């Protein structure tokens, strides 16, 4: 049973998946930082200094100035957080699209290099002549 588990755990796909998950988690932190520290301030500047993370609609109670106070007072719709996550998703999707596109291009080039070139008609004819001459000598 231990041998079977070892075979399962050391399969190429399992190791590739583990590496992918670890890289994905590190990549997620990097993308979150890019979105929160670079893109959101620029978007806030373009929109007049709006802080998306503090945007909300209070559904119950008196109007509060901050999201935290509004959540303590009752139900709120935190649409600013949704906007931030939507922008985050779009940026991640955009980056992944270009990564996959680049990887596909590299894979395609590698397949083209590995693929043997088809022989020209002259080459085929010369090969046939060589084979016929070799058969006549035997």
Curated annotation (Swiss-Prot):
SUPFAM superfamilies: Gated mechanosensitive channel. It is a multi-pass membrane protein. Gene3D superfamilies: Large-conductance mechanosensitive channel, MscL, domain 1 (1.10.1200.120). GO terms for cellular component: plasma membrane. PANTHER family: LARGE-CONDUCTANCE MECHANOSENSITIVE CHANNEL, MECHANOSENSITIVE CHANNEL MSCL. Channel that opens in response to stretch forces in the membrane lipid bilayer. May participate in the regulation of osmotic pressure changes within the cell. This is Large-conductance mechanosensitive channel. It comes from Bartonella bacilliformis (strain ATCC 35685 / KC583 / Herrer 020/F12,63). The lineage of its organism: Bacteria, Pseudomonadati, Pseudomonadota, Alphaproteobacteria, Hyphomicrobiales.
